[in-house]
Regions:
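Alpha/beta enzyme core
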Residues: 14-19, 26-84, 88-209, 213-219
């Protein structure tokens, strides 16, 4: 069956349900034992809440260690039946054995490389590895994080939800079915509920929000 992961995510979205994505940052795993330990901890934590965790993301905006990415994906595939979705920060984040990939365009980057050029370089790899591509508009919110720095982004101010909504509408009109609002790992502030609501009001696809979330209450 084609588009298995997207179909799975659509089922989560149906009825206005909210899902939590586990993100494994491969940069932190220099050895196989580190990955296996983390995999055990993650899977034990979510074994009773599988419906809340539809997929596992591997990567991150600053993840550049291709060998680490490959190691993490292979070990996670052995440990869980949950789909593994790549979240690459560059073409080095495209590795085999995953089920799908967030095929992102950093729409508010000032560097065309992150908008279309990296995608052109990575597309043949995605095809060769038979990864399910999830067309995603990646939007950096705020400034001062690794995602903002490495992506050379013109960060959308947290108090300007209509700007984010305009990008989301543009993404939808260009055929993208996913939007990711990213405050960035370690961000001092999370994406505001007002911005999420504003984007949701104009975007019909799958909306993801990350960065700066340190508690269940904030989430």
């Amino acid at each position: 069956m084609r588009n298995k992961v997207e179909t799975r995510l659509k089922k989560c979205k149906k009825g206005g349900k909210t899902a939590i994505f586990l993100l494994v940052d491969s940069e932190n795993f220099s050895t196989t034992s580190n990955v296996e330990k983390t995999a055990r901890e993650l899977l034990n934590a979510c074994k009773n809440m599988k419906k809340l965790f539809p997929v596992i993301l591997v990567g991150g905006s600053s993840a550049t260690d291709q060998m680490g990415m490959d190691r993490a994906v292979r070990i996670l595939r052995k440990k869980t039946k949950l789909p593994i979705v790549l979240f690459p920060g560059n073409i080095t984040g495209v590795v085999p054995k995953a089920h799908a990939i967030l095929f992102t365009s950093l729409m508010n980057s000032e560097n065309p490389y992150y908008i279309t050029q990296a995608q052109a370089l990575g597309a043949p790899l995605v095809r060769k590895m038979k990864l399910e591509a999830l067309p995603t508009a990646y939007l950096i919110i705020g400034e001062g994080t690794s995602a903002w720095f490495f992506g050379n982004a013109r960060g959308i101010p947290f108090d300007k939800p209509k700007i984010a909504a305009s990008y989301a509408m543009a993404a939808q009109y260009m055929g993208m079915r996913f939007v990711y609002l990213e405050a960035g790992s370690g961000a001092k502030q999370n994406v505001t509920p007002e911005m999420v609501q504003t984007v949701r009001s104009v975007f019909d696809g799958f909306l993801m929000v990350g960065g700066g979330i340190r508690s269940a209450k904030t989430a």
